[in-house]
Amino acid sequence: MTGLALDANLGGLPPQALLDAVAGLDPEMLRRYPETAPLERVLAARFGVDAERVLVTAGGDDAIDRICRARLRPGRSMVLPVPSFEMMEHFARLAGGAVVPIPWTRGPFPLDAIRRAVGPDTGVVVVVSPNNPTGAVATAADLEGVAEAAGPAAVLLDHAYVEYAAGDLTARALALPNVIVVRTLSKAWGLAGCRVGYVLGTPTAIDALRRAGAPYPVAAPSVALGLARLAAGERDVRDHVTRVRAERAALCQRLTALGLEPWPSEANFVLVECGPRARALMTGLAGRGVRVRAFPGRAGLETALRISLPGAAAAFAHLLGALDASLGAGAAS
């Protein structure tokens, strides 16, 4: 088997039919500026909302960037449970905003701490659920509490990994006027290379986000592939998610048996505390063709590794074998 890239939380392979969609693209599409409205209408229908409540973006990153540009400036702040997706802080600071970190590790969602942190200068409150890199989730009650505490500030609900979780907060979020939902086709839908994300919010919020970034954010072939991906249905997505959930449980069991400490996760990855064995384990895995993610310099994560789940039997067996061999080769000292 060739190397396993288990450091980027990739989804499963999209269906073969998408290659037919690529072959059938109209060359005229390539010389015209792209139109995202057809994809926005399809996404709106999926969630039972008007198209004016949907904005297609260049992946989730573009969506987060637009929210920060629209809501933050010098003197305004983002309340951010940490550890979190690194681009949150990056885009907040690019927009001139400050970041107010709220620790969220193995315990429940830090709703009370967020309530205390929100103030007149708060522009954005972030809820990443499932959280990256921990895999922890917030509940509907948590989201409602954040929305109430945020007042006029925007609540950014990052749902990039929600297909892998037991619960989906999108429907509840759509009933809360200050919540903006970020979702993507990059993870469970397998289109990371196309850079297709989207935002759900009120018409006023969506209009502001549309104006906060460049026009034509998503290339025409990516829009076409997004439409084809959704038209192909969800059966393969559900099958992929089922495999990943089974792998997640099995990986946590194996890591525990090996004397490591996996964090509970509802995403397509597991964060594992390795203690003094972290460096040796990462080196051992790399030597066996398995790349995982380390977090040097990230407070509280210095000796943790994040392992993506491949969603494929042969690849998962290779991962387990590499773990056993790496620890047996000296990482367990």
Identify the meaning behind each predicted range:
Residues 50-54, 75-77, 121, 159, ...:
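Short acidic capping loops at alpha-helix termini that bridge into adjacent secondary structure
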Residues 178-256, 260-263:
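PLP-dependent aminotransferase class I/II
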Residues 244-245, 256-288, 309:
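Conserved PLP-binding catalytic core of the aspartate aminotransferase-like
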Residues 284-288, 297-333:
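PLP-dependent enzyme catalytic core of the Aspartate aminotransferase-like
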